[in-house]
Amino acid sequence: MEAASTATGGVPRVFAVIRALSAVQAEGGRVTQLARAVGLTQATTHRLLQSLAAEGMVEQDERSKLYRLSMDFFALAAKAGNPGDLRSLCRPALLRLCASLGDSIFLLVRSGFDAVCLDRSEGPFPIRSFTGDIGGRVALGVGQGALAILAFLPEAEREEVIRFNLSRVREYGVFDEVYLRTEIERVRQLGYAGRNTGLLEGMAGVAVPILDREGRAVAALSVGTISARLNDDRLPTVVELLKREALAVGPKINPFDVTLRRPAQSLSSVRPDQAIQPAGQEQK
């Protein structure tokens, strides 16, 4: 591969072809199409593709002759990605926020139609939360963290979650579809979810989404505190600190992190019994 790369202009051209392939990964790309995308001749592009294929980074369908990045390429990317999972990546942010704000901080991650508490840093004030302890879960749309995640999902996914979860969120006694959609739009406009939902008496919270490189919400940072501590004067400061940490974490997320698909596997114990129950039920 080294000789071929040197003859055709080196590493920049190789990466140009890789980027062009990533843009057509679903359908695959032909030599002519890829050559136009990178501004090289077909002969040069073909040599680069063959060199990448020889290294196992590119594969060509025998029938269609279309090129795609190979599974070996993605396996290499996963291995070279951020070695820490989302929980490890966010732990310093939780500690900083807890120390700065003096309140309990939660890391929630999406798990199908739910949000799961992946980590928390306890503040000095006794509070209740929708997920309870680490491992607790709640329907997407219920509580600030789960609402922040739902609001910033791609539209098609968001609609699917709303349809599935509507009957679940109604169990809390204050939600209907109009209310939920209004809240989602409000969160999208403000960039955060909060403050007092009225579901937990005396409690308040605010959350911001953690977005991956594609702008998709994969998690949320949330503050849980007593209502008196989240007044109009303090809210902007809390939101700003949350957003700053979320923006710093987002670009570092490893898209191959198993936590994003199966968060329970990253927990030493999953305790969904500690989640806040719908209206009329006591937290265990």
Annotate each predicted stretch with a short phrase.
Residues S64-F164:
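Amphipathic alpha-helical effector-binding/dimerization core
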Residues A26, A37, E214-S222, I226-K284:
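C-terminal effector-binding regulatory domain of bacterial HTH transcription factors
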Residues T8-V11, V31, L66, S70, ...:
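Short, structured helix-loop boundary elements
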Residues P126-L199, S268, Q274:
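Short, solvent-exposed recognition segments
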Residues F175-A246:
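Extended hydrophobic
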Residues A20, A37, S88-S100, F106, ...:
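Amphipathic alpha-helical regulatory segments at dimerization interfaces
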Residues M1-G84, P251-P255, E282:
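N-terminal helix-turn-helix
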